[in-house]
């Protein structure tokens, strides 16, 4: 469609003739569009503004879009070539430049070819009243009405009181305002508060300055088309005879119209030669957009970067890249990732990207590649998360640039700051370091439970070096699988590899030890001088050398499982301390409540995990989450099973949530919900419940005392549930029995058959039990066995027995390894009586029943 722009309106805006919609509602075209983002609030959408150039077909004006209209650009309604009508705007004067700020507009055409050949107008003087140029001519004489105070008048050494140079401008645009290029030029004097700034004396004579530049006037130099006052208040006369008047006289002195000198002369009374030659027009005049500067950028070293630099470019190699992470804070949800950089000088710095920058750069960054990076914001480094030796880190935004380039051999692939293991002993806790050594041993992977009821893998190894010291290195998470398994295979084959760890964190949990963090990197059998030197030392003498560990003990597989029986939850008052107790029990599900086995949950992702808070039905098919303050069309279903656990000692109630519930039921809560309520298949639902009931599991429980309605209750939560593997459980029992051989028959788990039954291994029908063995009682509680006395009876009843500290004998009567004391032939052949200290004192041996575990 044919579109007509409002001709000449841009020049009227620049001259101050049109300032708002009350003067005119012009139709203009967008010829350039650029996003401007605040450096203080990069993550807030409201800080983004769009800057553009507006064309009337002839001239260009700079404009700024109100933030409330940003959605028009984001949706593509306004783009390059769009034709718009300004319905609410204002022309502001910002540092001698007119900026059109648009509050409301009407889009006429979303996209159109550039109309005409618009150009950016040259420099124009500003009228005090309206900011425009106001040059009047009266009877052949020109009276200069504009008063101009230029604070930079003395920037190039021109003093306010010194004889001023005659300025002659030879420009191809000299006739733009009907002034001949060869006509006599007015002498220009700039009143300046910075006189003599560049070392020129205030009273020194000045040379004549002749400007033969097409850009005269762009940087403060007046063009021939502009008529300025002298700025000193005296009439315009010959340069050689002009009187010196105070620079402030222009604001109070008399101004007289003087005839122009017939011939311009220099300070030496020589006629000024005409220097006019055909010149190229000023920049942006009768031209399109400025061509991109293809000159190679100046490379800055990382060590020289600081927050006060406006522009910089670094050439770097990416040494590591973190995974994409999501977060949620009071300002809303977000995402971020970071990567580390290294330059040719060994400088290192971390780069962090948020939100839109993540989408722009995440797939572009590849570890090991070389890039040119510029236009980032330098922020103070957060040392809690940044281990690099740099006080700053770079934050990228949508205006930043990352340009891949060819590999540069001068930039190393890695940069280490190795410390001897002996030095680690004196380093501060939670500090980071690089360490290299020989792996002497490694443990299997074990699962550790976190406070948020999630499991994480852990694996430990011993590292030693030429300092004669060794240290425990703990691997967490994914390091246990890839690197950990490779190290395990090498150690099992008899090859003790060289391991370099970059960015390990020093801890003091078990003496001094080194642990991996998210930014850690493993290098197995690396090929650099430190590794080769270490390998040669180990083959020469290190293999048989003695080492002192700076860790108190090698934890190996980590903390063993605390095996308990259900009765011990009450007997030992578990969960009543400040921290919860974590135990493992072997129990059977004897009952399950099926009325409310699940709840409706919020599926909205909160970082890497769903919200999972309870949602309510709005009645219109949508569900509302109070925490997220949002409505969703479909909810999720999560388990909240109430189950009764029972073993040979007691029973207790426990709650199993989503993950543990799926392990118990073998299906998702949503599927089970549909079976019962959607399909209403009660028979199938009951079959599923019956298949779970009376099944033995190994339960990991979290025991914690909580308050309900001002009442203290001990609550058990199922963290993990595994169906009982009889083979592995038998091995566990045999190991427990072997470790209990130091005790007597009381070391076996006993089950009371009646309330009158005394579960001591030796008691008479009428007497009391013999002296108890402290070691056996402690061993029972360590491995989850009931105490030798009645179940639940415990206290400070420790009386040592020399027999408990003896050798690994099974019978404390005859010291034989072939049987236990209860089946000792010596006792069988003697008269029945009470056994005490190896003698029979009457009574008889009671029947015993060894309960299942």
Swiss-Prot record:
User: InterPro entries attached here?
Assistant: Euk_RPA1_DBD_C, NA-bd_OB-fold, NA-bd_OB_tRNA, Rep_factor-A_C, Rep_factor-A_N, REPA_OB_2, Rfa1
Question: What SUPFAM superfamilies does this protein's entry cite?
Answer: Nucleic acid-binding proteins
Question: Where can this protein be found?
Answer: Nucleus
DNA-binding positions are 312-399
Subcellular location, principal: nucleus
From what superkingdom does this record's organism come? Eukaryota
Q: Which GO terms label this protein's molecular function in UniProt?
A: DNA binding; zinc ion binding
Q: Which UniProt keywords apply?
A: DNA damage, DNA recombination, DNA repair, DNA replication, DNA-binding, Metal-binding, Nucleus, Zinc, Zinc-finger
Q: Where is this region: Disordered?
A: 118-282
Q: Name one GO biological process term.
A: DNA replication
Instruction: Establish whether keyword Repeat is in the entry.
Output: no
Q: Does the keyword RNA-binding apply?
A: no
> What CDD domains does the record point to?
RPA1_DBD_A, RPA1_DBD_B, RPA1_DBD_C, RPA1N
Polar residues composition-biased segments: 124-144, 159-173, 180-194, 201-211, 222-249, 263-278
- List the record's Gene Ontology CC terms alphabetically: nucleus
Start-end of C4-type zinc fingers: 602-628
- Self-association and partners: Heterotrimer of RPA1, RPA2 and RPA3 (canonical replication protein A complex).
- Annotated family: Belongs to the replication factor A protein 1 family.
What function does this protein fulfil?
A: Component of the replication protein A complex (RPA) required for DNA recombination, repair and replication. The activity of RPA is mediated by single-stranded DNA binding and protein interactions. Probably involved in repair of double-strand DNA breaks (DSBs) induced by genotoxic stresses.
Can you name this protein? Replication protein A 70 kDa DNA-binding subunit C
Q: Which organism is it from?
A: Arabidopsis thaliana (Mouse-ear cress)
Gene name of the encoded protein:
RPA1C
């Amino acid at each position: 469609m044919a579109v007509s722009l409002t001709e000449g309106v841009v020049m009227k805006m620049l001259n101050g003739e049109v300032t708002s919609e009350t003067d005119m509602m012009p139709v203009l075209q967008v010829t350039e569009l650029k996003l401007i983002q605040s450096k203080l609030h990069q993550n807030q959408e409201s800080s983004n503004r769009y800057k553009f150039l507006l064309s009337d077909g002839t001239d260009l004006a700079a404009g700024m879009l109100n933030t409330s209209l940003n959605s028009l650009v984001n949706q593509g309604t306004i783009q390059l070539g769009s034709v718009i009508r300004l319905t609410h705007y204002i022309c502001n004067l910002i540092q001698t430049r007119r900026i059109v700020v648009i509050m409301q507009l009407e889009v006429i055409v979303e996209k159109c070819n550039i109309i005409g050949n618009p150009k950016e107008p040259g420099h124009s003087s500003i009228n005090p009243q309206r900011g425009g140029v106001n040059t009047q001519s009266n009877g052949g004489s020109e009276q200069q009405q504009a008063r101009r105070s230029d604070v930079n008048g003395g920037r190039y050494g021109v003093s306010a009181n010194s004889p001023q140079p005659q300025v002659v401008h030879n420009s191809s645009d000299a006739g733009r305002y009907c002034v001949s290029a060869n006509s006599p030029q007015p002498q220009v004097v700039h009143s300046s508060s910075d006189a003599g700034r560049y070392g020129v004396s205030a009273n020194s004579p000045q040379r004549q300055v002749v400007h033969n530049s097409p850009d005269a006037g762009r940087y403060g130099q007046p063009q021939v088309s502009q008529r300025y006052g002298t700025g000193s208040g005296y009439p315009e006369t010959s340069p050689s005879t002009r009187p010196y008047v105070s620079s402030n006289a222009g604001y109070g002195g008399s101004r007289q119209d003087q005839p122009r000198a017939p011939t311009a002369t220099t300070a030496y009374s020589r006629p000024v030669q005409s220097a006019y030659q055909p010149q190229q027009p000023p920049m942006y005049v009768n031209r399109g957009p400025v061509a991109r500067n293809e000159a190679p950028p100046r490379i800055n070293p990382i060590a020289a970067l600081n927050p006060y630099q406006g522009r910089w470019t670094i050439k770097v190699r990416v040494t590591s890249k973190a995974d994409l992470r999501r977060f949620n804070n009071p300002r809303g949800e977000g995402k971020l990732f970071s990567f580390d950089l290294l330059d040719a000088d060994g400088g290192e710095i971390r780069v962090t990207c948020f939100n839109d920058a993540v989408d722009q750069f995440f797939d572009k960054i590849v570890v090991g590649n070389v890039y040119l990076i510029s236009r980032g914001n330098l922020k103070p480094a957060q040392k809690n998360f940044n281990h690099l030796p740099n006080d700053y880190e770079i934050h990228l935004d949508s205006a930043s640039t990352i340009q891949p380039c060819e590999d540069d051999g001068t930039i190393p692939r890695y940069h280490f700051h190795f410390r001897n293991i002996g030095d680690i002993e004196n380093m501060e806790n939670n500090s980071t370091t690089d360490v290299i050594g020989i792996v002497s041993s490694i443990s299997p992977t074990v699962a550790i439970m976190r406070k948020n009821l999630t499991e994480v893998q852990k694996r430990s190894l011993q590292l030693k070096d030429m300092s004669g010291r060794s240290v425990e290195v703990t691997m967490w998470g994914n390091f246990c699988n890839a690197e950990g398994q490779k190290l395990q295979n090498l150690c099992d084959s008899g090859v003790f590899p060289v391991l370099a760890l970059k960015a390990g964190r020093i801890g003091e949990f078990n003496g001094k030890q080194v642990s991996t963090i998210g930014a850690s990197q493993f290098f197995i059998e690396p090929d650099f001088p430190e590794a080769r030197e270490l390998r040669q030392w180990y083959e020469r003498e290190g293999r048989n050398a003695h080492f002192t560990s700076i860790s108190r003990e090698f934890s190996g597989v980590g903390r063993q499982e605390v095996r308990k029986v259900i009765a011990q939850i009450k007997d030992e008052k578990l969960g009543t301390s400040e921290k919860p107790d974590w135990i493992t029990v072997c129990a059977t599900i004897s009952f399950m409540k099926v009325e409310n086995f699940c709840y409706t949950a919020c599926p909205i992702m909160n970082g890497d995990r769903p919200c999972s808070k309870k949602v309510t039905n709005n009645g219109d098919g949508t569900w509302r989450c109070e925490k997220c303050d949002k409505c969703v069309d479909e909810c999720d279903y999560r388990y909240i099973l109430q189950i009764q656990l029972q073993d040979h000692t007691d029973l207790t109630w426990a709650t199993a949530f989503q993950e543990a519930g799926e392990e118990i039921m073998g299906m998702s809560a949503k599927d089970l919900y549909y079976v019962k309520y959607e399909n209403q298949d009660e028979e199938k639902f009951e079959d599923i419940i019956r298949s779970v009931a009376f099944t033995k599991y190994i339960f990991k429980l979290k025991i914690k005392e909580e308050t309900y309605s001002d009442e203290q209750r001990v609550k058990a939560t199922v963290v993990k549930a595994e169906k009982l593997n009889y083979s592995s459980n038998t091995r566990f029992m045999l190991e427990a029995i072997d470790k209990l051989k130091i005790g007597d028959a009381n070391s076996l788990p006993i089950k009371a058959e009646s309330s009158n039954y005394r579960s001591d291994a030796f008691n008479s029908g009428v007497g009391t039990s013999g002296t108890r063995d402290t070691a056996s009682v402690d061993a029972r509680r360590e491995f989850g066995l009931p105490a030798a006395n009645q179940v639940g009876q415990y206290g400070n009843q420790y009386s040592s027995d020399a027999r408990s500290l003896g050798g690994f004998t099974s019978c404390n009567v005859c010291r034989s390894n072939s049987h236990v004391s209860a089946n000792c032939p010596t006792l069988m052949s003697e008269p029945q009586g009470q056994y005490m200290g190896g003698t029979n004192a009457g009574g008889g041996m009671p029947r015993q029943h060894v309960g299942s575990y």
